């Protein structure tokens, strides 16, 4: 069976493209996460990579993908403002899973950014958009280009936020296949998988964090909060990585 080519899908009109992707996603919904990863590597044209923020449950996706293809590049967009525990977690998982870690950063250092723009995360939604564009979106775009990625794996899940609740397993984003093998997993399924494989959570989970990003835009969970409320002061959920560029530059995350 020939591999599914991005150019083939993009040559279809919008309706045909939607129908073709829907047909494939219907089939993928019947597979396990492990089977989905194998299917993607066998059937999608292009070099694979997996992005990771090394958050609370990051070990799941990293193990799933590298268990099938051990040399898959793992892309980290490092803002320079991660928790010390996150950097330690990165080292732990990189050594334990023998990860092919590829770190990308903004063109401007954190100190240059603060000198030029002030503390963007304190400047409302527009400031957060600017910050995320500099530190997450642009470095990721560069990573996909430099690594010549054709299949981008990510560990997004529908129950993490309302903005992710209708995401498909397979889509096209910014000119590459986007593939979400655990999109329909619950927190319980994640927990069982980590236990089964003997994999760790991020160390800050034990201190009350449900989601971990930068130190200045992450807070502990408190009663009455949704998981998405613990990031970006509750103003937004996404950092911009998981949207098409046109959308990110327009209505936002």
Swiss-Prot record:
A molecular-function term among this protein's GO annotations: phosphoadenylyl-sulfate reductase (thioredoxin) activity
Swiss-Prot/TrEMBL GO biological process terms: hydrogen sulfide biosynthetic process; sulfate assimilation, phosphoadenylyl sulfate reduction by phosphoadenylyl-sulfate reductase (thioredoxin)
Pathway: Sulfur metabolism; hydrogen sulfide biosynthesis; sulfite from sulfate: step 3/3
Predominant location: cytoplasm
InterPro entries associated with the record: PAPS/APS_Rdtase, PAPS_reduct_dom, PAPS_reductase_CysH, Rossmann-like_a/b/a_fold
Active site positions: 239
Keyword Lipoprotein listed: no
Enzyme Commission (EC) number: 1.8.4.8
Protein family according to the UniProt entry: Belongs to the PAPS reductase family. CysH subfamily.
Function: Catalyzes the formation of sulfite from phosphoadenosine 5'-phosphosulfate (PAPS) using thioredoxin as an electron donor.
Protein name (database record): Phosphoadenosine 5'-phosphosulfate reductase
Naturally occurring in which organism (per UniProt): Aliivibrio salmonicida (strain LFI1238) (Vibrio salmonicida (strain LFI1238))
């Amino acid at each position: 069976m020939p591999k599914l080519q991005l150019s083939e899908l993009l040559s279809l009109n919008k309706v045909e493209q939607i129908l073709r992707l829907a047909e494939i996603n219907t089939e993928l919904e019947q597979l396990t996460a492990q089977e989905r990863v194998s299917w993607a590597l066998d059937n999608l044209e292009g070099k694979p990579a997996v992005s990771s923020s090394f958050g609370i449950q990051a070990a799941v996706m990293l193990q799933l993908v590298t268990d099938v293809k051990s040399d898959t590049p793992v892309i980290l967009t490092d803002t320079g403002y991660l928790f010390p525990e996150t950097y330690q977690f990165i080292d732990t998982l990189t050594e334990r899973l023998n990860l092919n870690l590829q770190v990308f950063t903004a063109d401007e250092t954190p100190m240059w950014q603060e000198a030029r723009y002030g503390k963007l995360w304190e400047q409302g939604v527009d400031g957060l958009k600017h910050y995320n564009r500099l530190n997450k979106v642009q470095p990721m775009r560069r990573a996909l280009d430099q690594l010549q990625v054709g299949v981008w794996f990510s560990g997004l899940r529908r129950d993490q936020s309302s903005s992710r609740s209708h995401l498909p397993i397979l889509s096209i984003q910014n000119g590459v296949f986007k593939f979400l093998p655990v999109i329909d997993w619950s927190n319980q399924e994640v927990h069982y998988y980590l236990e089964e494989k003997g994999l760790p959570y991020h160390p800050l989970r034990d201190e009350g964090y449900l989601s971990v990003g930068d130190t200045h835009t992450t807070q502990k969970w408190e009663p009455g909060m949704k998981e998405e409320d613990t990031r970006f002061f509750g103003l937004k959920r996404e950092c911009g990585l998981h949207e098409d560029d046109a959308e990110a530059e327009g209505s936002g995350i």
